[in-house]
Amino acid sequence: MLTEHETMDSLVGTRSVQHIMWRNDAVGPYLLPTMNKASGPNVPLGLHPSSTSSSLSKVFAVLSVLALCMWLLVGHRAADTRLALDTVPLQDVCPQEPAYNVTEALEGLKLQFPSVLHSAKLLSEAVQIDTTVGDNIPDTDDWAEYWDSIFSPFADWIQTSFPHMHDTASPVRRELVNKHGLLYTWPGSDPTLKPIVLMSHQDVVPVANETLDQWIHPPFSGHIDIENQTVWGRGSVDCKLWLVSTISAVETLVKSDFKPKRTIILSIGHDEESDGKHGAQHLSAELEKRFGRGGIGMIVDEGTPLLSSADPGSYGVPIAVPAVAERGAMNVKITITSRGGHSSMPPPHTSIGIMSLIIAKLEAHPFPDVLGDESSASIRQLQCVRDGPYMPYELRQALLKVEQAERALSDKGTTSCMHHMWPRMNRLHLKEARLDEARTQLMQALDYASRQLLKTTQAIDIVRGGIKVNALPESVFAYVNHRIAPYAKVSTVVQHYKGLLVPLAEQYRLALSMDDDVLVPPTNATTANVQIEKSGLLYDSHEPSPFEGSNADAWRLLSGVIRETWHTDEPRHELRSLDDDHVPKHNMGQYKDSVRVSPSIMFANTDTRWYHNLTSNIFRFGAMTLHPDLTGMSPYLHIHTVNEHASIDSIVKATQFYANMLVAANHEPIERV
């Protein structure tokens, strides 16, 4: 999009209009020639002072025609930009599916859900079993006793706590994959329907000993807090909330004598917090072996949650934001080796000093704040809450400009006059440039934390080196963690390193290698060796699952079930006492205000990274409460840190959601066309 003070010489390519500016004032768009200071204030640039008035008239006549054509090119709606920005209907940018009628799909069957107390106790008991897993743990065959001590008690608890699905007469079959991965299969009556998979994981992240005194309740107490309607402890959200609720949903359906047409699968890993290579990788391979590549209809795993009106990112609008993709991931290890010796005779830069230069270089050049076409789900999420009472005015206006640019780009009309007069003008290019500029302004309008969730990031997390204060460090290493935006790839990060560090290596006489690629070879003058290695699991972001068009059946079904399960006019489910054993009522149409739903991009990574061989219909959704947290502490801000907790309403609603999802998938198409 051409803006004020932007020249058109690159678009037109002729000197006579080289300094024409496009203006868009209240009276409408027009072209204005700028003045050449050397020629005087009243002479357009490109015309000699001796030009006749006739020449001037001809020039301005041409400019008038060009202005008319430009107005037709950009669109006559531009004159009403301010009005249009205020009147773009929200439903045009945030369409909503109707709530799915689960009651009708049940065909008279009554589901026997657990009581609120029983659901709370199940989550509490799960938290009390410590299933902590750290990084870089050896394989289950090498450390069999270690793995058994953690996960065998938990698997036994699951089997005891959900008796109906584990009964010998149950249609559900349980298998152990790679010893501790749990795979539950409930065969459907119609083998032509691809299975639906619900995922979760058993493991939790460690609790740092130095933080124990910061916990309101001990991290593995599973304390049921009646006052705040909360279950406290490590894993109460990530991921035992969803593990318990998915299993509870299947237990409910078995107990209620539900008969699935579509095969139902629970795939439960045991090292997601590490990288999933012992759990999810083996589970995925087993499912591909049984059902073939692309043999699964739909996967729902943990992921981005429901946001209450009080949660960050909602801007005051309750909304569900299931992720249709997740960012890629890459760890980089930087190792520097140099000559040691006594610190009384130091070189200009020690290995630690060189590492400091490299880190400073990286942090001085972060990845750009940009949005691409692959960011459409993230933009949709913002658009769906642009009427929120807490959204800043500048951000709302930036969103509206993106919407206008998207509309202009989707307008396929042409203007014949422009084709004749400006054959080199690329109308599509102008509209794409306008959209790029609008997206840039949108990123600039976001706060720093929000921008980090949408772009490729880097974080220097570990630096180690040196052994004694008077000894030159012979080696130092650092780890950098990257999360890769959907529009970028691992190769993008690799090129970023090469572009920054090759000149630095040449300047300071460093030998530089990246994996097996020698970027700057060593010489007799080399002062240190720098080795860069891609470390851990490398993971490119995948294309977002469709949320529009002919292949969006799975998304539409998921959205409809979410809107059936959560309503802003529904009160929270409460546990009045530890003797209160009431069963939550299933929604029978008494609640009308369904929650909004928007696709999003998962800012972190899940076990689904291993499941792309099975389906493109992968959704990452954190089924929780829609109500503000009574503790005053957002549960999303306490995952992986002190005071992790989940509301009692969350475990009740999550169980209802997964049961509703399985019932709906029994009746509706989710396969790709």
PLM feature segments, named:
Residues 4, 22-24, 28-31, 36-61, ...:
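Metal-dependent amide/peptide-bond hydrolase catalytic core
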Residues 48-50, 54, 58-60, 69-234, ...:
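Acidic/His- and Gly-rich active-site-bordering loop/insert found
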Residues 124-132, 159, 163, 167, ...:
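Sec-exported extracytoplasmic/periplasmic mature domains
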Residues 127-128, 183, 197, 265-268, ...:
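Structural recognition of the beta-strand scaffold that forms the well-ordered cores
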Residues 133-134, 191, 202-205, 271-275, ...:
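Solvent-exposed loop/turn segments at secondary-structure junctions
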Residues 192-195, 260-264, 294-297, 593-594, ...:
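Loop/turn elements at helix/coil->beta-strand transitions in domains of secreted/extracellular proteins
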Residues 227-238, 595, 642-643:
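Short pre-catalytic strand/loop immediately N-terminal to key active-site residues, enriched for Gly-Thr
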Residues 230-321:
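Acidic/histidine-rich catalytic neighborhood of metal-dependent amide-processing enzymes
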